[in-house]
A protein has these predicted regions:
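Catalytic cores of the polymerase beta-like nucleotidyltransferase superfamily
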Residues: 1-272
Length: 272
């Protein structure tokens, strides 16, 4: 109701506004969205003028948090991103009045859909088709998307694990080609994605990170495990495969058990 109210207020004042991103993906899949993001043609100061309680959470990038019933909803102006020299944030941001230009900058097609009750679903990059096919695919050029934010490579693997999807060929090839860039990402951001992956319904997808060269950079111990046979007639898997099988044997809803089974985070390391 709060999301609909925010969109309605923006529209009544002459602006476009849509729910966007993961909340749309999850709603289509019948999953409960963790949060709701709104994108709008209104500039940050225009958004602030329409609502009683707002927070400048990322105003330099066009984001204002609107508070409704003590819950925050991020409202971000349509934007075009400049270069990403830190492999995380754009150096410059240009606001635009064009929704499609805003959707172009997003990571994966399944996260680049927008919806409001007036217009309906806006799906310029066949996100619905990729949801139906069970595919993780970058919006536009995969090399460009991963060069903008190297964490997106691990996010692709994490989404595949959470949703039971496969990674589209060109997207996976781009990960393999740019895997070394993951060293530019902080250990904290990587660990968040890694924990989400290992506590997903398909933790074995970590093998995709191994095959594409990602774990060689941020978790070289796992590569050693994958390449170490047990030399035991009772164990047909490598140490790495055996570890993943053990993790998979723990139900996904037993998060604490999963975390105790996985590689201890205190041993988490990265090589540069």
């Amino acid at each position: 109701k709060s999301v609909k109210m925010i969109i309605t207020i923006l529209e009544k004042n002459g602006y476009e506004a849509f729910a966007v991103g993961g909340c749309i993906r999850d709603t289509i899949l019948g999953r409960q969205p963790q949060d709701w993001d709104i994108t709008t043609s209104a500039l940050p100061q225009q958004v602030k003028a329409l609502f009683n309680k707002t927070l400048d959470t990322g105003i330099q990038h066009g984001t204002v948090t609107v508070m409704m019933s003590r819950v925050g909803y991020e409202v971000t102006t349509y934007r075009i991103d400049g270069e990403y020299n830190d492999s995380r944030h754009p150096d410059t941001v240009e606001f635009t009045s064009n929704l499609i230009e805003d959707l172009k900058r997003r990571d994966f097609t399944i996260n680049a859909m927008a919806y409001n009750p007036t217009v309906g679903l806006v799906d310029a990059f066949d996100g619905i088709g990729d949801l139906e096919r069970g595919v993780i695919r970058c919006v536009g050029n995969a090399m460009e998307r991963f060069s903008e934010d190297a964490l997106r490579m691990l996010r692709a693997v994490r989404f595949a694990a959470q949703l039971g999807f496969s990674i589209e060929r060109e997207t996976q090839e781009a990960i393999a080609g740019l895997a070394g860039n993951i060293k530019k990402v902080s250990a904290e951001r990587i660990q968040v994605e890694l924990v989400k992956l290992l506590t997903s319904p398909n933790p074995g997808e970590l093998k995709v990170a191994y095959r594409t060269g990602l774990t060689a950079v941020f978790l070289p111990e796992f590569d050693m495990m994958m390449e170490t046979p047990q030399n035991n007639p009772h164990h047909c898997y490598s140490v790495g495969e055996h570890t993943l099988k053990a993790i998979e044997a723990v139900p996904a809803d037993k998060v604490l058990d999963r975390k105790s089974t996985r590689l201890n985070s205190s041993h988490y390391s990265r090589s540069r």
